[in-house]
Structure formats: C-alpha cells, structure tokens
C-alpha cells in the first residue's frame, strides 16, 4: 500500500510519526509511509491530539474530519482526512 491514497474525495494517509521533534512538519517518505514530525511527546495521547490538530490545519479541515483509523498507540498510523480543502505539496506529489 502506498503512503497516500485518495478514496472517494477523502485521503488515506499511512504515517510514521516522530514525536518530540524540534518543529511540526511533513518530512517526506519513510519507506512506504509518509513521515510526520511533531513537537508533542508521546504521553497520555498528547501526540495524537497534536497530530490531529496539525493535520487539520495543514489540510484546512476541522479536527473532527481527521480520524486515526489504525495505530492509536504506535508510531505507525493510518489516518483518514475527510474531503480536504487543501493538499500540501509534500502530499500531492505522492498521490497516484
């Protein structure tokens, strides 16, 4: 499976998360996943909440439209973004 898949207007992202980074950013490909660095530590769900907020801002959607499908407790996550208003260039170049 590829890092980014478009499904009926939604985006399905396979992510590798790097918590406690110096800044929030979409880094690029990491194997067959998209690497995302976030500043939040992986404690008490802070990283997941921060990731959802960061992705919502990057794709111009409400936080309620960002779903963690798989990987709630790990670094490897599958995320669904419902009808993104904007697709960051790092992601659009990976679309099939």
UniProtKB/Swiss-Prot annotation:
Coiled coil: none annotated. GO terms for cellular component: cytoplasm. Pfam families: DUF167 (PF02594). SUPFAM superfamilies: YggU-like (SSF69786). It comes from the Bacteria. Belongs to the UPF0235 family. NCBIfam families: DUF167 family protein, PRK05090.1. This is UPF0235 protein Sputw3181_1321. It comes from Shewanella sp. (strain W3-18-1).
């Amino acid at each position: 499976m590829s890092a980014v898949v478009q499904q009926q207007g939604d985006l399905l992202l396979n992510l590798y998360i790097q918590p406690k980074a110096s800044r929030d950013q979409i880094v690029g490909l990491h194997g067959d996943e998209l690497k995302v660095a976030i500043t939040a530590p992986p404690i008490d769900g802070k990283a997941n909440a921060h990731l959802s907020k960061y992705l919502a801002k990057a794709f111009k959607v409400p936080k309620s439209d960002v779903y963690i499908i798989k990987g709630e407790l790990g670094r490897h996550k599958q995320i669904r973004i419902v009808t993104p208003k904007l697709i960051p260039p790092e992601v659009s170049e990976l679309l099939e």
